[in-house]
């Protein structure tokens, strides 16, 4: 039985992971759950899964949860704050940690789990793209393992040789007869929109993905295709891939989740209906597979599968992320922080959709940071850039 801690249990990934655990109680046991401040969902999760521990980042929410658990006579211990969250990520009794906290808030807890030698089921891409060198170095020295949850990286993982699966980031693609990886992306809800149309889209429109049910932040990132740029960076680190070894392809139907081109001419792909439970369940059960309630792919109902090259003019955030990766970890940290503030401001209706790119570009172009020498340097860059980005948003409002 695998003993699980979920970082970000009240979000989309966490809720879906718990639904898989609920269907497979003989395979998984929940040891600890972590969330930000959604105490009502956390209360329900405690009632259903009886974790030994939970941690809420928000102290007020933790206080409310303690009262409600006591009233319900549930013995789960409630902790609060980042220090306690990191402690739960490294619990001795846990062997698998699902890293699903959104954004840079997931960095330190994920690193804590890595240093403790856990198997990390990674959905929090921000922790890897901003601190890839330190992340992979810690992974190597601790003996921890990493399995990606993102549908694209999970799809690639599924069709890789076992040698790479067991040693992500430690071996080259070329040594395993791989010519390149193909990251697919739907193009989001706006891939047919004109530039003038994009300036008027609403947060609700941006969060209405045609194929996937996701959280708000990642939905907006999908709409700008920043998400694909971040996934490009994630793939570079995870699979130790060179720039020439990654291709990006727009695939609006979201049936082929990614592909691996081998030197012998074989192109291996992972196909399924667009349901994140497929990749979550594979990550949780690897190297085995388990039954899920995901519908099977029916080829008779698929009219056609289409593919396009990405248009960097229409999706400049994608190009911005690819270029930032080539500039180093400081640039990726700057871009990630600026984007988190810009997306949050758009969701709060403070800025227009097209301003997301403008803010990202201006902050990235105007920032000049030395390459980080440690995690603390990355956190400091992140802190300073968030201030710059918030000031930029304020200047656009007033």
UniProtKB/Swiss-Prot annotation:
Binding site for NADPH: 10-13, 37-38, 124, 126, 215
Residue sites binding Mn(2+) per the record: 150, 152, 231
Pathway entry: Isoprenoid biosynthesis; isopentenyl diphosphate biosynthesis via DXP pathway; isopentenyl diphosphate from 1-deoxy-D-xylulose 5-phosphate: step 1/6
UniProt record similarity statement: Belongs to the DXR family.
Designated gene of the protein: dxr
GO molecular function, one term: NADPH binding
Subunit structure: Homodimer.
UniProt KW Oxidoreductase keyword: yes
Keyword Oxidoreductase: yes
InterPro entries: DXP_reductoisomerase (IPR003821), DXP_reductoisomerase_C (IPR013644), DXP_reductoisomerase_N (IPR013512), DXPR_C (IPR026877), DXPR_C_sf (IPR036169), NAD(P)-bd_dom_sf (IPR036291)
UniProt KW keywords: Isoprene biosynthesis, Manganese, Metal-binding, NADP, Oxidoreductase
Cofactor(s) recorded in Swiss-Prot or TrEMBL: Mg(2+); Mn(2+)
Top class in the EC scheme: oxidoreductase
Pfam family, one: DXP_reductoisom
PANTHER family, per the entry: 1-DEOXY-D-XYLULOSE 5-PHOSPHATE REDUCTOISOMERASE, 1-DEOXY-D-XYLULOSE 5-PHOSPHATE REDUCTOISOMERASE, CHLOROPLASTIC
Stated name of the protein: 1-deoxy-D-xylulose 5-phosphate reductoisomerase
């Amino acid at each position: 039985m695998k003993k699980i801690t979920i970082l970000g249990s009240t979000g989309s990934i966490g809720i879906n992971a718990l639904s898989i655990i609920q269907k497979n109680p003989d395979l998984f046991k929940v040891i600890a759950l972590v969330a930000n401040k959604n105490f009502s969902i956390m209360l329900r999760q405690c009632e259903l899964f009886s974790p030994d521990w939970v941690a809420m980042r928000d102290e007020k929410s933790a206080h409310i949860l303690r009262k409600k658990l006591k009233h319900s006579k549930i013995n789960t211990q409630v902790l609060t704050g980042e220090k306690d969250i990191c402690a739960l990520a490294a619990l001795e009794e846990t062997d698998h940690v699902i890293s699903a906290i959104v954004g840079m808030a997931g960095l330190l807890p994920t690193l804590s789990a890595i240093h403790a030698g856990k198997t990390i089921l990674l959905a929090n891409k921000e922790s890897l793209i901003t601190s890839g060198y330190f992340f992979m170095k810690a992974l190597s020295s601790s003996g921890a393992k990493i399995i990606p949850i993102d549908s694209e990286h999970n799809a690639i993982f599924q069709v890789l040789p076992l040698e790479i699966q067991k040693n992500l980031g430690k071996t080259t693609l070329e040594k395993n007869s791989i010519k390149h990886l193909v990251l697919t992306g739907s193009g989001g809800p706006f891939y047919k929109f004109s530039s003038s149309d994009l300036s008027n889209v609403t947060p609700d429109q941006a969060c209405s993905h045609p194929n996937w049910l996701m959280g708000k932040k990642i939905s907006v990132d999908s709409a700008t295709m920043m998400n694909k740029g971040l996934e490009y960076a994630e793939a570079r680190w995870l699979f130790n891939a060179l720039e020439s070894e990654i291709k990006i392809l727009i695939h609006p139907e979201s049936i082929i989740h990614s592909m691996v081109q081998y030197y012998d001419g074989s192109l291996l792909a992972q196909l399924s209906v667009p349901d994140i439970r497929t990749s979550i369940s594979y990550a949780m059960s690897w190297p085995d597979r388990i039954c899920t309630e995901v519908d099977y792919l029916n080829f008779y109902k698929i009219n056609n599968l289409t593919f396009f090259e990405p248009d960097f003019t229409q999706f400049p955030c994608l190009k911005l992320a690819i270029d930032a990766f080539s500039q180093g970890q400081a640039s990726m940290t700057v871009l990630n922080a600026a984007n988190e503030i810009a997306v949050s401001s758009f969701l709060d209706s403070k800025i227009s959709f097209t301003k997301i790119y403008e803010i990202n570009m201006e902050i990235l172009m105007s920032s000049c940071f030395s390459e980080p020498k440690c995690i603390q340097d990355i956190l400091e860059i992140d802190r300073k850039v968030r201030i710059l980005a918030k000031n930029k948003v304020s200047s656009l409002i007033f």
